Amino acid sequence: NRNKIENEYFESNDEFNSKCIPILYKEVNYNFIYERIKKYDPDVMIVFGSSIIKEPLLSLSKKNKFLNLHLGLSPYYKGNATNFWPFINNELEFLGSTILHIDSGIDTGDIITHVRPKIEKNDNVHTIGCKIIQESAKKMGMILNLIKENKEINRIPQWNTKNEKIYKLKDFNQGILEDYLNKIENGIVQKFLLEEEEKF
């Protein structure tokens, strides 16, 4: 189901259009990666779906030019699968992504912008995820244009919230998946849309 949905949203998007350095997820903080990127001296670096970036790689950050696309709304949802957990917690208002300046924490950098999807009645975690990625890519393009034009980009420090949640891969299990499927079957998305409609 997931592959089918991703193919609908991202047909013919299994290759990069530009030259890139292939880096395996677990290798991101290895010294040979640091040396290679240092030699390459990129104008801008964007992290998406990586583990935490550590020193010395973090030190290559140029002012406002090391960005992280986090698929979750920081500071509320951080860590892993952060557009899955709002379904479990009945908090669909926290679906989205955050484009932020990278730092050494888990999705804790200063915020550039949030991206929110248009939620529709037949959506699920996969369709929502694809919509968020599409909208985030458009927004990232706009931010890169600002950087290219030497314009300032937002730098909003994350605020304290008692609702902050940090999820790890180990939090995901069979019971949680069954809970998600039950919520979809019982109309969590439709109920959310109805509640949103009633606010206006």
Where are these regions (language model features)?
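One-carbon transfer enzymes
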Residues: 1-200
